[in-house]
Every structure is written in C-alpha cells, then in structure tokens.
UniProtKB/Swiss-Prot annotation:
SMART domains: RAB, RAS, RHO. Interacts with VPS9A. Interacts with TCTP1. GO terms for biological process: early endosome to late endosome transport; endocytosis. This is Ras-related protein RABF1. Endosomal protein probably involved in endocytosis. Probably not involved in vacuolar trafficking.
Amino acid sequence: MGCASSLPDRNSGTLSGLSNSENAVPADAKNLRVKLVLLGDSGVGKSCIVLRFVRGQFDATSKVTVGASFLSQTIALQDSTTVKFEIWDTAGQERYSALAPLYYRGAGVAVIVYDITSPESFKKAQYWVKELQKHGSPDIVMALVGNKADLHEKREVPTEDGMELAEKNGMFFIETSAKTADNINQLFEEIGKRLPRPAPSS
C-alpha cells in the first residue's frame, strides 16, 4: 500500500501537466529547481517516502497511487544552495508501466525504490535501472533506495545486493524507513549535493 490517499486530489498528475523542461533549471548558482521522479513496484512505499519528506507524515492505511501524484518541496543545503524538488510519484502497478516514460522524460533525478522484504520488488528495481539507462537523460542523477528498513527482521534483500547494483550502475544507495523517517531527509540532501551546478556567469 502507498500513502497516496493522504495527498490532495489537486496534486494528482495528468499527462497534460507534464513538462519536458531542462533537467535542472537554476535561477542562479545557489537556487536550483529539478524534476524528480520516483519509480518502483507497487507497495514499496514511494508515496510514503514523499509524504514523509514533504509533510513529515506517515499513513500505513492509505491506498495505492493511481497514475501519478505531484508534490514539491524546497531544501537548503549546507553550502547555502537551495533546491526545489518537483516530485512525480508514479504508480507501481504493471498496467501503468507504459506511462512511466512520460513522467521521467526531462527528469533530472530518478529515485528507484524497492522493499527490502520483497525480492520481486528488487528485480523490478533492476528493470527500472535498465529503462532509465536506455531512455532517461544522459546526465540524470539516479538513486537506489531500499525502503522499509524498519522491517529488518523480515529482510529478504541483503544490503550488499543493493550496494552492488548501485555501484555497478553509477548510482548512490541508501536504505530508508518512511515509517520511522530514518534516512528520508538524508536521501534528498544527498541528491541535492549531486545535482550539476551551473557555471558562474562571467
């Protein structure tokens, strides 16, 4: 289950609302705006990660995302750079897979999420890595996230497997828990640090 029911209807994404703008659009070198898309199997907690990051909330009883949801959040990094994330949370159900390229086209960041208790979701994460390598922007920042780290007693995907997949594909890896908020802010802070910076104007 996702956290989609906690998101207002006005934030639901539609195809007409998609933008193919630049991957990261700076107002200046210290103010960045970037389109971020979350990909992964249904039920891995993509919406819960977004809701925890944007609103500091967690809803274990919510419904799955249908289509896609849109939210935005701005953070300040230690170097005084501000990053505005325009976050597209895509549906994980198989019938929506064909729509995913419409959401990650033009994205500067892709966050691929799997559930550490679900080997099947890890296989799907590998699929999304390949899809992004084929069709994503060449300079896209990619993160691999093993979610539900609080369920360590039910773990079926070793941490080492996630680390290996990320290392092989030039991604960074982190394990999170949307339920406890563990590593959620750290995930987005690390993404912000890895975004390309515009050259200073002369």
